[in-house]
Amino acid sequence: MNKYLVLLATLFMGMQAASAQNLTQGSLEVLRSQQSVKVVVDYSNAIIMDMTEAEFAEYEEDWYKDQPTIISDLIDEVNQRSGHLLYMSAHRESDYTLRWSVRYIYESGDIVSDFYLESADGEVVAKIADVVGEGGAFGTKLYRIKSGAESTGRALGKFFKRELM
């Protein structure tokens, strides 16, 4: 009996995690008139494999070198999965910025994040909470994190497509 309860609880929590992202503040309506959105990443409050970002950077010497690839992996997946409704870029200036606020990165590379859509003056226009991306099963820590970024991008891209179509 207890085995079945544990199994049911696990299935329920897995289903919640798979559909966890939701718009918890504001509206995405402003994006309908935009052609591009700048994307930045914020690790300032992140716990990365039980370490702060600074501690993880000491442990993993390629952390700062690999960050452009990590954000690029996320952006590529968002652009593709959203059906190219918007052009997301880490380098193009825009009226709006999407701030990827990473909360947790687990050993598996799973990433839990919030996303904030901010106007040019820094006002938060919308918040998308609890976006979960699954990391990789094999490889180095950075490889698993990159897999988590891709998965996060897929989830966010599908969310944008659903919300903006």
Residue ranges and their predicted role:
Residues S19-S72, K161-M165:
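A structural "domain/chain start" motif
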Residues Q21-V30, D121-M165:
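C-terminal/domain-edge helix-coil "capping" segments
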Residues Y64-S72, D76, K146, E150, ...:
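Short, well-ordered alpha-helical segments
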Residues R81-Y143:
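Surface-exposed short loop/turn segments
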